[in-house]
C-alpha cells in the first residue's frame, strides 16, 4: 500500500463468511490472514487494532469461528480470520474439514499478502503452532508472529518467554515478532507497521 494512502482503521466491517473459494470476494484488495489456536486472542487482536469493541466476536467457547471471516477495512484492505486450530472438542472429521478449508485459502488465494500467526506468549508454542509456522515458511508466505496476552506476564520476563517461543518455532530472523496485549494496548503500532509493510 502506498505511503500516501491513509487507512482509516475505524472504517471496518465484516464483509462475508466463506467455506470455500467460490464464496471469496472477487476483487484484488490485499488480504492479511489471521491464524492461531482457539482462544489465543484472534478476535481481541482484530478488535484492538481496529479500535472496535465487538467487530470480531470474542467467545469464551473455543472453536467458535468455523468459516473464513472477511473483514473490510476502509475499502483498501481485508483481514481474514481463519478458524482456530487445536480445539479438542471438535470431531476429527470437522478438524480435517477446517484444515482443508484453511489450506485451500492459504495456498491458492492471490490476494493474500501475509499471515499474522498468533501465539500465546505465556506458553511454548503448541504442535499446531509449529506446524502452522512451518507450513507458511514452506509455501514462502510472509509471516508476522504476534505473541498475545503479554499483560499476563511481568514485563521483566517478556524476553525469556519470547526466546522460548522463537526457539520452539525455529524462528526466522527475517520475520517480524511482536509482543502484544489487547488489555494494555501494547503492540498495536508495531502490528500496523508490519501489516502495512506487506500490503
Curated annotation (Swiss-Prot):
CDD domains: YihA_EngB. It comes from the Bacteria. Gene3D superfamilies: P-loop containing nucleotide triphosphate hydrolases. The keyword Ion transport does not apply. Mg(2+) binds at residues 43, 65. GO terms for biological process: division septum assembly. InterPro entries: G_ENGB_dom, GTP-bd, GTP-bd_ribosome_bio_YsxC, P-loop_NTPase, Small_GTP-bd. The keyword Nucleotide-binding applies. Residues 28-199 form the EngB-type G domain. GO terms for cellular component: cytosol. GTP binds at residues 36-43, 63-67, 81-84, 148-151, 180-182. Belongs to the TRAFAC class TrmE-Era-EngA-EngB-Septin-like GTPase superfamily. EngB GTPase family. HAMAP family: GTPase_EngB (MF_00321). This is Probable GTP-binding protein EngB.
